[in-house]
Structure formats: C-alpha cells, structure tokens
Amino acid sequence: MAFSRFYLLTALYTGGILASSAYGIPSNYPEHHHRLIERLKKNSTQDSDSSPSESSPHPRQEPRRHVLTPVHNVLKDRPCDEGLSISKLLHSIEKETNSQISVDFTILPQWFYPKKAALATVDEKQPTWQFYISPNVSWQLYNSPTAGVGSIDFSYTLIRYWRNSAQNANNAAGIAGGINDYSSRTNTLSQLTFSQTFPGDILTVAMGQYSLYSIDGTLYDNDQQSGFISYALSQNASATYSLGSVGAYVQFTPTPSINIQAGFQDAYNIVGTSFDVYNLTKNKYNFYGYFSWAPQCKLGNGQYSALIYSTRKVPQQPTQTTGWSLNFGQHLGEKLYVFGRWNGATGTAINLNRSYVLGLASANPINRNSQDLLGAACSISKVNPKVVTEKRIRKYETVIETFATIGFGPHISLTPDLQIYIHPALRPDKRSAKVYGVRANFSA
C-alpha cells in the first residue's frame, strides 16, 4: 500500500511538471491498429458516453504554482465523494498527469465437449474459469514544436485460472489451437516503451519492451477481452514471436495513411515475464518489418497490413523461424466491418503453421449501447506435423465462432460466445467439438 501511494504521488508530481495538453498516442493515425491504442480509445469512448458534458478537454482547476498542485487537484475532484469510483479516480489522474489509463477485468467461464480426452476415464471439471486483468497506460511527457512528442506506454497481462485450465479443456476437446488466447497462468509485460516522435510526425523512434501481437491484427481478431475468444481468431495462430521482449524500432509515417516499421528484439525473452536488458548482450536478436496502409474511401475506412519477422534459436524456443501475417479490415458503411488474415511460420515452435481467417462484425447495430457488438468468423488452420506427432491426426482444423456483446452502461458488458470446431485435429474419432462461454467484462 505504501508503495502504491508513493507511485501515485510520484506520477502526479512528474505529470504536473512535464505534461502538456495532448496524449502520448498520436491521434492523426486512427486506422492503424494497435492493441494498446484500441483499449485506450474504447475507454475514452465509454467516458464520453457516460459524461457527455466532460468529453471536451478539462481546464485545470488550479494553476500549477506548486509541485503538489496535481495531487491537490485530484483530491479536489473528490473522486470517492459518493463512494469508491475507480473510473472517476482514474479520470482525475488522467487530467492531472496528461495520460490515458484503462483497466480491463474479464471473467470467462467456458464449457466444452468432449468432456474428457481420448484415453482418459474421468471427465474434466467444468467450467474452466479464466480471470484476465489488463492495465494500460499512455503518458505523454512533453510536446513541443522543437522537441516533438515524448511518451511512455505500458501494458500488462495477468491471467489466472480456477477449477480447471484451458489447457486441460484443449486436451479433452482434442483441438490443436485453443479455446481462448491464454491456456494457462500468465504474467506478461506486453509493453513498456519510451517513444520519441520528431517534429512533423513523420519519424518515431521507440525503445523498451514490446510485442508484435499489438500490431498483428485488426479491430476484432486481436484482443480476447473485446473481440473473438478462440485462439485462432483472437491472435495470429501461427505466431512464433515473443509475448514481450526488450528492443527498439523505427516508425516512418510519410502520410497519415501509411505506417512503416522496422525493429529488433532480444531473442531470449519468449514469454515476456520480465524486463531483461542483460539479454541484449548475448547477441541474438529477432527482427521484423511491418507495412500498414489505411485508406479512406466512400464505403468507409480500412486497413491493409503486412508483417514479416524472423526469430533466432534459443533455449526457450529451440528452433529458428520465419513468419508472416497479412491482414485486412474494411468498414462497409457505419455498421458493418469485414476482416481477414493469412499467416504462417516455418520451424517447429508451435502446433499450427498456417491459418486463414475471414469474418465480419457489427458495432452498436441498433444504436443502443456503444459496447454492443455482433461478430461471426471462421478460421482454417493447418496442423504442424513436426510438432503434433500423434499417429492419428487431421491435417486441418476449422473453428467457427460467433458472439454477441451486450453493454450495460459504460463500463460493464456480457458476451455469450459459441465456438464449433469441425474435425478437431487431435480427435479423429470426433466430427466436432463445441465450446460455450460467457465473458463478463468490467472496464475503467
């Protein structure tokens, strides 16, 4: 508790000295997908829905004549005056530190069939209960015509299971993919970077810990907390890059519709559990290149992107790989969004080495709540026979998933979800496997 209080006061103090009136994430590239940006944007939309009169920038309550003025202003807002309100407290901190903050907490029970593995005699416990917490922060340190924009971005993923794990459910259902994005207990520092955007908004240099998962995808097939849930539809199913590793990248944005990146990372930190700079001295690096085009047309905005990467052989992942991912997402009018992905990887790092995705989504289809969302998609994945070595397996596995997110106010939503696996790869004795789930999401 003492540490938390110290951290909060330090952030308020530093923000009061360095901050200006704009956020750390550029607002002039809205269609280039980034998981952190989407989460913060979603939180900002919810705040404007709940408090329309507060959607414009807030004037400071008191001129900053003292280093503790930001702390005084937060307390003056009385965020807990009518009971504990985390969203109001975070909103007050955002105003005074010139930052964007979001915290998403998801509870996901899932039921599955078949209930037991092929050679098992006892049914697996149902449902699996997944608890997913993800805090995200973008903090702009400075913004000036001569120095440009400097910001710190942070994202963390914490996964816990109760009663049973998704890994056991995967084994029982006989699927080579997964019933969700994280099949077991996880602690991942997805992002902790400092970025410098030079005047003109054309060149950005970033250094720190980051993951390619943040840019590899489109609006609804890249985040289990807000879009599709199954492994093959919530991320790149053949990805062999790190969940988070230290490195650096350069971003070139000649026009708002074009985004080009190239970078490197330490090859040793595969799961991103720590921020380890020492590994950079071991001289093994992963490299990537990324291109995104976000055109604007009469039908609606879209994004078309290509990612290519290579990873080195290290003890934590003892195979060298080369991978690629082609993505598209296109708005067709105000309510319909279509998307697709083709991705693959060489080597023996993962069960699936090819995946093909096609789907559609409709946000707020009846103008009831900004969180309302309907989605349906299909993924066909090719099983990697060098990794899945059982005698009897299927070469391909198909999952069809549909869900409906129902918003309750600005911060709570429920999402019934259905996944049907046609010809599960590891259960040739079964024609299909089914997974039912209800995602409860609480955001602040």
Swiss-Prot record:
Keywords tagged on the record: Amino-acid transport, Cell outer membrane, Ion transport, Membrane, Porin, Signal, Transmembrane, Transmembrane beta strand, Transport, Virulence
Compartment(s) of residence: Cell outer membrane
Biased composition (Low complexity): 46-56
Residues spanning the signal sequence: 1-19
Main subcellular localisation: membrane
Membrane topology, from the record: Multi-pass membrane protein
GO biological process: amino acid transport; carbohydrate transport; monoatomic ion transport
A GO CC annotation given for this chain: pore complex
Listed Pfam families: OprB (PF04966)
InterPro entries listed in its UniProt record: Carb-sel_porin_OprB, OprB_sf
Region called Disordered, residue ranges: 42-68
Superkingdom assignment: Bacteria
Homology family: Belongs to the OprB family.
Record function comment: Facilitates L-arginine uptake, as part of the AaxABC system. The arginine uptake by the bacterium in the macrophage may be a virulence factor against the host innate immune response.
Protein known as: Porin AaxA
